[in-house]
Amino acid sequence: MELCGFEVGLERALFLIAGPCVIESEQLALDTAGRLKEMTERLGIPFIYKSSFDKANRTAVESFRGLGMEAGLGILEKVKATLGVPVLTDVHEDTPLQEVAAVVDVLQTPAFLCRQTNFIQNVARQGRPVNIKKGQFLAPWDMKHVVEKARAVGNQQIMVCERGVSFGYNTLVSDMRSLAVMRDTGCPVVFDATHSVQQPGGKGGCSGGQREWVPVLARAAVAAGVAGVFMETHPDPERALSDGPNAWPLGAMEKLLETLSTIDKTVKTDGFLEAEYRLN
């Protein structure tokens, strides 16, 4: 599949979707995107910058949600114009989709909304590539129905994203088999390495996270075989205004990407035996 001027899939190099969880300021966005662009260019990794102008799914009403659509889209537009990188943001049921699609290159649908048929189809109708996050409650094989809803309105540029599955209260686990299962949708599969270590509501009024496991899960996912990796990153995660506990430090990103790129090249050169031996 072509995405933002480059090809993605199991026959192509790993691509990266990365940035802070939420847009905090123009300067932070430009600085973070600039550093990510530099490191991905050095490593030959196609890169899409991500950040949210509104985080509707927050644990508590007083949690920081973002700068709002007008200011947020203006900052994303500045990132595109200044750095020449494609941008992604997530949308919600009450988002003016046409206004967002006029600015960003990729639309993302939140995991909790993956079963909302009207929403998925309305997003797909905007004519932009869509990254559909699998719900924490959903079996990987059920994503084929979600994809069919999006394709039914004429959008063939669909990606599916694994971000962990609920495992009791306040914790998620990642089943690497789901990455192979979701290939059956015919879509590029993306692994969200940072939300997969989130502890939803785990700190009472906000979510916790175990960022030390980000590289473990990222390595495992790339070894399993994915088109791309999604990672939220921040120059100072302890001071991030949203999802800091599971954000990967920007200063440690390049070393992790080097490792992931090496693994990706190895597994994609050798092929995927499970495609031959899986029983349908």
UniProtKB/Swiss-Prot annotation:
Signal sequence residues: none
Q: Which domain of life is it from?
A: Bacteria
Q: What is its EC number?
A: 2.5.1.55
Q: Where found, per UniProt?
A: Cytoplasm
Q: Does the keyword Metal-binding apply?
A: no
- Which reaction is catalysed here? D-arabinose 5-phosphate + phosphoenolpyruvate + H2O = 3-deoxy-alpha-D-manno-2-octulosonate-8-phosphate + phosphate
Give this protein's Gene Ontology molecular function annotations. 3-deoxy-8-phosphooctulonate synthase activity
InterPro entries referenced in this protein's UniProt entry, alphabetically:
Aldolase_TIM, DAHP1/KDSA, KDO8P_synthase
Question: What would be one Gene Ontology cellular-component term for the protein?
Answer: cytoplasm
Q: Which UniProt keywords apply?
A: Cytoplasm, Lipopolysaccharide biosynthesis, Transferase
First-tier enzyme category under EC: transferase
Q: In which pathway does it act?
A: Carbohydrate biosynthesis; 3-deoxy-D-manno-octulosonate biosynthesis; 3-deoxy-D-manno-octulosonate from D-ribulose 5-phosphate: step 2/3; Bacterial outer membrane biogenesis; lipopolysaccharide biosynthesis
Q: Pfam families under this entry? A: DAHP_synth_1
Question: What are the BP-aspect GO terms?
Answer: keto-3-deoxy-D-manno-octulosonic acid biosynthetic process
Family, according to the entry, reads as follows: Belongs to the KdsA family.
Q: What is this protein called?
A: 2-dehydro-3-deoxyphosphooctonate aldolase
